């Protein structure tokens, strides 16, 4: 199992339901609204600090 990492939201499009996170080290990671934990409307804001686990997706690594 991968370790939890920290990063910052680069951008997130509420209408499309996806965006990118810039980890503390390594390349930017794709993030989809279904991967966001919590109740209610799932969104992220630019500049928001987040923690995540990187996993292999269909097109590469994602949060």
Curated annotation (Swiss-Prot):
Q: Could you list the residue ranges that cross the membrane?
A: none
Assigned keywords, A-Z = Activator, Cytoplasm, DNA-binding, Stress response, Transcription, Transcription regulation
- This protein's record includes keyword Transcription regulation: yes
The molecular function terms in GO held by this entry are: DNA binding
Domain CSD, which positions? 7-63
Q: In its UniProt entry, what is this protein called?
A: Temperature acclimation protein B
Factors inducing expression:
In response to low temperature.
User: Cross-referenced Pfam families, in alphabetical order?
Assistant: CSD
Q: What does this protein do?
A: Affects cell viability at low temperatures.
Q: Where in the cell is it found?
A: Cytoplasm
Name the major location: cytoplasm
* GO terms for cellular component: cytosol
Please give the PANTHER family that the UniProt record associates with this protein: COLD SHOCK DOMAIN CONTAINING PROTEINS (PTHR11544)
